[in-house]
Amino acid sequence: MFKIMKDFTEQEKIIVLDFGSQYNQLITRRIREFGVYSELHPHTITVEEMKALNPTGIIFSGGPNSVYDKDAFRADERIFDMGIPILGICYGMQLMTTHFDGKVERAKDREYGKADIHVENPSRLFAGLPTDQVVWMSHGDLVVEEPAGFEVTATSPSCPIAGIADEERLLYGVQFHPEVRHSVYGNELLKNFALNVCGCKGDWTMENFSEVEIAKIQEIVGDKKVLLALSGGVDSSVVGVLIHKAIGDQLTCIFVDHGLLRKGEADQVMATLQGEFNMNIIKVDAKKRFMDKLAGVSDPEQKRKIIGNEFIYVFDDEANKLDGVEFLAQGTLYTDIIESGTATAQTIKSHHNVGGLPEDMQFKLIEPLNTLFKDEVRALGTELGMPDAIVWRQPFPGPGLGIRVLGEITEEKLEIVRDSDYILREEIKKAGLEREIWQYFTALPNIRSVGVMGDGRTYDHTVVVRAVTSIDGMTADWARIPWDVLEKISVRIVNEVDHVNRVVYDITSKPPATVEWE
């Protein structure tokens, strides 16, 4: 039986140090796929802080710097002396090499893309893998002399030292990126590191995660009360059920109908969470309040801030009617934390659960999902006994339709998005594609175009259909929806939604785009 670990340090885990690679979150995600808990930390972490985490293994990510740059990212060198396994990837391998007095130089030509490597010495890292394999390279420097005590484990035509290992000290490095899907046996290599080198059992599951989180919530909250920002989306709904299992009626859910919800959403949320789970939900009609604040505002960042601030002020108003409320719960995910920026990465956009809170907020935050990716949240919801109708609902941002209407928000524009999105969801479900497509929705860009309807000229709105496939939301590809399904969606939207004469399909992946338009 799983032992509830109130002390987080008891849990086996692999820490990924962030040196600025665009792929570092993928490393964390891949390790978790093997049933091993992993999380990302800045490269500035001290050895004392690292010891407090009690990691089973450490991975140094890649990064854009050269190890010889004046301002290159460094790690606390004492981490190398902790006596636990370390894997350096790309820049991480070069950092390990220079620390142990090996030699790194600028490559004559930068190498980006697929490459063939030959495994010279399998070591534990390459155990059971083919001698020749395709990997993904992305580097401008390379190791030209391995440190004393290390062996060369892999080579490639343009990178004579593509892998190194010191088996005695359990130190390993690879010049390529095993976390990227283009590295054909990358997953197997990372699994070797996690299970064979680090000795992890691979028993991290949503069952033990929920038990640990329930125990933590009970310990943190005690006999106090918690307010939950219930948006109606998957994340906040799962948070609500998790916290309700931990503290029961000490949880009060504040469901704010801000006028930015999907069609029929308010009624569905109340019927499911209040009716089936007997949760205490206060519904607040704040449509006019939000629309007044958003009037004339076009900038997406400003809209996010206004919506985030107004949410908190609504909660303040409701909290004043309750006694003993000290905590605010949110459905912040790990991807939200990462996308809102770390010490080594540029902020992509301030997230509604991360960067939209006022400085004078009166509550302590509880974010029990902030170490999980979206697919893990769905798995947790299923583990908690939630119905598929909630667990597999389409992801919905905290600012709601406020960021799916580009530019200024009006009632007319909101109705267009509501009705078109409803049609899209109906047709995707009819086609049996709702589990195959990770996320799909409509958005209203601030674009009007000329059209012909009946015998007359029109000058009306354009609706964008956005649909992507993904595993965890960190990267995404546009979904290949069959043409006949797209045709049905387009015909219905143009004919059934007022003031729309054009439908376009977004075929951009993430990156370079994000999933949402704002």
UniProtKB/Swiss-Prot annotation:
Top class in the EC scheme = ligase
The UniProt record lists the GMPS ATP-PPase domain at 204-393
Its EC number is: 6.3.5.2
Subunit composition and interactions:
Homodimer.
Free-text function comment from the UniProt entry: Catalyzes the synthesis of GMP from XMP.
Alphabetized UniProt keyword annotations: ATP-binding, Glutamine amidotransferase, GMP biosynthesis, Ligase, Nucleotide-binding, Purine biosynthesis
Instruction: List the Gene3D superfamilies.
Output: 3.30.300.10, 3.40.50.880, HUPs (3.40.50.620)
What cellular component terms from Gene Ontology apply here?
cytosol
Q: Which PANTHER family match?
A: GMP SYNTHASE [GLUTAMINE-HYDROLYZING] (PTHR11922:SF2), GMP SYNTHASE-RELATED (PTHR11922)
Glutamine amidotransferase type-1 domain boundaries: 13-203
**Where on the tree of life does the source sit, at the highest rank?**
Bacteria
Q: Which GO terms describe its molecular function?
A: ATP binding; GMP synthase activity
- Reaction catalyzed: XMP + L-glutamine + ATP + H2O = GMP + L-glutamate + AMP + diphosphate + 2 H(+)
Protein name as annotated: GMP synthase [glutamine-hydrolyzing]
Name the pathway it acts in: Purine metabolism; GMP biosynthesis; GMP from XMP (L-Gln route): step 1/1
Q: Where, by residue number, is the active site?
A: 90, 177, 179
| Chain sites annotated for binding ATP | 231-237
Question: SUPFAM superfamilies, alphabetically?
Answer: Adenine nucleotide alpha hydrolases-like, Class I glutamine amidotransferase-like, GMP synthetase C-terminal dimerisation domain
